[in-house]
Amino acid sequence: MTVDDTGSGADGDGRVDPEPAPDSADPGEDPLALRLEGLILGAERRYTPFQAARSAGVSMELASRFWRAMGFADIGQAKALTEADVLALRRLAGLVEAGLLSEAMAVQVARSTGQTTARLAEWQIDSFLEGLTEPPEPGMTRTEVTYPIVELLLPELQEFLVYVWRRQLAASAGRVIQAGDDEEMVDRRLAVGFADLVGFTRLTRRMEEEELGELVEAFETTSADLVAARGGRLVKTLGDEVLYAADDAGTAAEIALLLVETMAHDETMPELRVGIAFGTVTTRMGDVFGTTVNLASRLTSIAPKDAVLVDTAFAEELIRTRDAPASEAAAAEEAAAAEKEGEEPPVYRFALQPMWQRPVRGLGVVEPWLLTRRDGGGGEA
């Protein structure tokens, strides 16, 4: 919903250019689509982009930047905007004018919100229609059924969306507060894990599209549930791969092993391999970047099937937090010493086995470690 803003707004002398002539409405627009739009937006079309920007007191250039950031299509000067579009512009611009956000940050807010909700909206509509096996009335098409479904679900989903957003915002704010210093709010030490389905490309050639979609959905759903349940954060899903982060190495290790164990018990799933690295990570717009992330990805590519490889920094962190012994020999010595003193031996959740050093593209020579559970260990039910 962007426009060509050349020549729009005020010029260098403060003169306001005349309003562009509105484009004629598309006579081919589906009446049902227009009714559905009116239902969802809760208002009728009243403004062209130029009129909306002027009503909001925002320059055409800034309005266009916001709309592009939100992912809206170019509509020229068609009368397609509502009072809500004006209010949204006014609010974003107001945050900038009040000094609460810089202009660049306001654009980032618009972009992150647009990208997230665009995917959410596509997923919800597809899921609702896919799950509809029988129309409410005989002879109704799926297209015709969309209106009553949206009419019933819209208010409930809107409230649910705000609830989940507030919960996620509280959790994210809590992580920032716990980071302690200002530098760690953007650049933090995290454990980052990649989980990758082995042989996915070959599967795409053998499986029907519907079967492939079901497999990917099952993988993403299972991964998301396990990551969240164990206290990690799912950063993103890439079809055959998921990226997650955790504040501590023990949590990341537990998630990785549970993912491998869970997928191994599902006969419909290919083998899984996981790579984890620990170190400084830059966070931007919900994503993570940096050498640590790249290393985790490279470790995944060299990991054996149904196995977890970690980097040296991650192994050292597990040893430091007493989640894993430095070696099995060291664990045996500690157990013997504890027994001699009549004390309980230390209990470790994980075991680490150093692997051969090997070159990794773009990162030089690394020493991966194989992560497993200690004998007698196991994931929580």
From Swiss-Prot:
**Where does the source fall among the domains of life?**
Bacteria
Query: Sorted alphabetically, which keywords does the UniProt record give?
Result: ATP-binding, cAMP biosynthesis, Lyase, Magnesium, Metal-binding, Nucleotide-binding
- Name the residues that bind Mg(2+): 196, 240
PROSITE patterns, per the entry = GUANYLATE_CYCLASE_2
In this chain the Guanylate cyclase domain maps to 191-300
> Could you say which EC number(s) this protein's record lists?
4.6.1.1
Q: Which GO terms describe its molecular function?
A: adenylate cyclase activity; ATP binding; metal ion binding
Q: Which reaction does it catalyse?
A: ATP = 3',5'-cyclic AMP + diphosphate
Does Lyase count among this protein's keywords?
Answer: yes
Cofactors demanded by this protein: Mg(2+)
Any Pfam family the entry gives: Guanylate_cyc
Q: Which GO terms are recorded in the biological process aspect for this UniProt protein?
A: cAMP biosynthetic process; intracellular signal transduction
Which InterPro entries has this protein been placed in? Answer: A/G_cyclase, Adenylyl/Guanylyl_Cyclase_3/4, Nucleotide_cyclase
Instruction: Give the residue ranges for region: Disordered.
Output: 1-30
| The protein's enzyme class | lyase
Q: Identify its protein family.
A: Belongs to the adenylyl cyclase class-3 family.
What is the name listed in the Swiss-Prot or TrEMBL entry for this protein?
Adenylate cyclase
Organism name: Streptomyces coelicolor (strain ATCC BAA-471 / A3(2) / M145)
At the highest ranks, the source species' classification is:
Bacteria, Bacillati, Actinomycetota, Actinomycetes, Kitasatosporales
